[in-house]
A protein has these predicted regions:
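Non-catalytic propeptide/linker segments at domain boundaries
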Residues: 1-49
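Secreted/periplasmic proteins that engage bacterial cell-wall peptidoglycan
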Residues: 56-140
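Active-site scaffold segments
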Residues: 79-87, 164-168, 187
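Short, solvent-exposed loop/turn and secondary-structure capping segments
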Residues: 94-98, 163-164, 199
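...with weaker cross-activation on analogous glycine-rich loops/strands in unrelated enzymes
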Residues: 106-185
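Low-complexity, Gly/Ser/Thr/Pro-rich intrinsically disordered linker/tail segments
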Residues: 180-194, 199-217
Length: 217
């Protein structure tokens, strides 16, 4: 109807300014015309394009050591490192005015504080979203990977990502190790700090299916 058309036009105009204002009651009517994130208010500053080259450069430099400018988490540093890569690639932080750790994506150098989305794999993925592929085939998963992409896995298929890595290189050569065949790719990550090809003994992505029978990527 005319009301829906006007709402869609209004969002199309305001989205260029970084503001989405559609009411939840409208979403069920408009359906697939709008993304679910249309219920969120974003920064009025247009998003900068993600610079994969700078992100890859940062990942290579800091995969095997901690950057003293950031906090570190000995119990699990993968998302913290992924966030640093995102920042190096030009993604802008979104601060919560109240310092609410459940909102935004940010860290504070002075207090070493962070949002949950900065340091937890589950919340990082919920904040930035997932790709369209989820499945248990490591070969299919590897075929869709490209350099400059974040990757993750869910060990129990409960819908929450448990670990995040970052791809710095990819080739089209099929490898078979640890009982799985895949297209080889190179991962930079923390929580197991390395920068290595999956086929390398230093990288454990090829053996995950043995440790986690219900794993999905």
């Amino acid at each position: 109807n005319d009301e829906i058309i006007q709402e869609v036009k209004k969002v199309a105009t305001d989205s260029q300014k970084g503001t989405y204002h559609i009411k939840k009651s409208k979403l069920s009517t408009i359906g697939a015309l709008l993304p679910e994130t249309a219920t969120l208010k974003t920064s009025a500053t247009p998003k900068a394009a993600f610079n994969k080259s700078k992100a890859i450069e940062y990942a290579k430099n800091w995969a095997t050591k901690y950057n003293p400018q950031y906090p570190k988490y000995s119990s699990g540093d993968c998302a913290n490192f992924a966030s640093q890569i995102k920042l190096a690639g030009g993604t802008k932080m979104t601060h919560a005015s109240s310092g609410n750790v459940k909102k935004g994506w940010w860290y504070l150098r002075t207090t070493r504080g962070t949002s949950n989305s900065w340091r937890l794999a589950r919340d990082f993925t919920r904040y930035f979203g997932r790709s369209t592929y989820t499945g248990s085939s490591f070969k299919t998963f590897s075929s869709k990977i490209t350099a400059g992409r974040f990757i993750g896995y869910d060990t129990t298929k409960d819908g929450d990502v448990d670990h995040i890595g970052f791809v710095t290189a990819k080739n089209n050569k099929l490898k078979t190790t640890e009982g799985v065949t895949y297209y080889n790719f190179k991962v930079a990550q923390h929580s197991g700090m390395y920068h290595a090809w999956v086929s390398s003994k230093d990288n454990g992505w090829d053996a995950l299916h043995k440790k986690y029978p219900k794993i999905s990527y």
